[in-house]
């Protein structure tokens, strides 16, 4: 098991975030819950029909949060997969929605359309050969043949990529497959959604600062608790890096560590998944709370902003 489990980022206004990712990009709203460590803040999960690992983008919407600052030790870009012939559809859709985008370019032989979300998070759509044969969630507005197929991958901006590369290969089983300009590409064997990580090494750039539009952390997959524990042991033994104690996030179990380049990484289990507390048919409809917060539901609901239409 390898590749990206989910990406968690910081947003500003929650309703604006919801509208952009569900209506403009057509992702499914998989879960409406709260930040377990800060229950006065929502935690939104977007993904495919069931929220499979490799499709999940999550947000902490902090109204009034200052903008993040680009720099090393941060995620530079989060990219989604779409069918290779769908970029013209997406360029037209973004234009119709008033979303600015850059002229399409090619990276590693694939067409790429780059743009930013309402909070300044750098995003890309990558046309992938063969993706048209993969299943996709459709919101009824975006035709299934053009819909997003989960993550393509992420690009990390680093002052020195050497030690980060060793963590990717030794702990997560990725392998270096290509280099292009300042980018080094790593791939997870056999994985489609979320199978790629690019490292961009830049000398002399100041360290980034987290805020609105920043990625908070990147989570990588572990099949279960046992595989997660083995990864954590290897982190200490092979790299001198210590993960946190395991935290139960209800839909997966997590440990966290900061990789040598400064990016916060998580190792998240594939189990139990998002249908553990509501049926697949109604995912994202109701506010779901973990058992330890359920006694405080009325208090929590009173401080959360209203989400009409979410």
Outline where the language-model segments fall.
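Non-catalytic surface loops within mature trypsin-like serine protease
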Residues: 13, 48, 82-84, 117, ...
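Surface-exposed interaction/gating patches
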Residues: 145-232, 236-242, 259
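N-terminal beta-strand motif that seeds the catalytic metal site of vicinal oxygen chelate
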Residues: 1-16, 75-82, 130-165, 211-221, ...
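A short, acidic/glycine-rich surface segment
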Residues: 65-67, 132-139, 202-207
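Conserved donor-binding loop and adjoining core beta-sheet/short helix segment
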Residues: 31-36, 46-80
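Core segments of cupin and vicinal oxygen chelate
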Residues: 10-53, 96, 104-114, 156-200, ...
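Vicinal oxygen chelate
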Residues: 2-12, 33, 63-159, 179-198, 233, ...
